[in-house]
Amino acid sequence: MTIFSLWEDSPLTVIKGKNVILRPLKESDIPILYRYIYGKEHTEWKKYDAPYYPLEPMSLEAFASAMEKHLRKKEPPGRMIIEHLGEAIGTVNYYWEDESTRWLEAGIVIYPSRFWSRGLGTEALALWIDYLFQHLEIARVGLTTWSGNPRMIRAAEKLGMKMEGRLRKCRYYQGVYYDSIRMGIL
């Protein structure tokens, strides 16, 4: 992993791996992310990323307004773009489940399915977890998924994450019950 600033005196970091780069969100990424999330072209990702929560429609203007906080945020950014061969293909993020107890959860989405099952998500998540441990005062990074997303579970296990909890049959999607999976790494 190589970490460097975007430009001299820049507080924002770029994280370079072998096949992916994690970089801060740019204004020019907003319409790309909007098309991935709300467009008709790349919808396969939503079948695996908490599909039991409906995706509420949003205008591009409202989406851009919601993304502005990520444009202004300094280190450490809460969301970064995953780039592969110069193309923005997804995002990594973190959020505080409970900041007062330093309980942090991370997430990842690769939107176009043509980039799945190539190790890009695993590499991006590894870079992101390393970055979070280096830049935040935390002892653990958590990740929550569901039993309907075996690729996410495999990627987390490859990185040394342990299954810390399994809430059985608490996710209901298309007439089938699934388990909620809590994973973590110290």
Set out the residue ranges of the language-model regions.
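An amphipathic alpha-helix signature
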Residues: 27-34, 38, 60-64, 68
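Short loop/turn motifs at secondary-structure junctions and domain boundaries
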Residues: 70-75, 161
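Short, P/G- and charge-enriched loop/turn segments at secondary-structure junctions
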Residues: 8-10, 66-70
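Short loop-to-helix capping motifs
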Residues: 39-40, 149
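Acyl-donor (CoA/ACP) binding surface of acyl/acetyltransferases
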Residues: 1-32, 79-186
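Conserved GNAT-fold acetyl-CoA-binding loop/helix
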Residues: 42-67
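Structural motif
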Residues: 40-41, 136
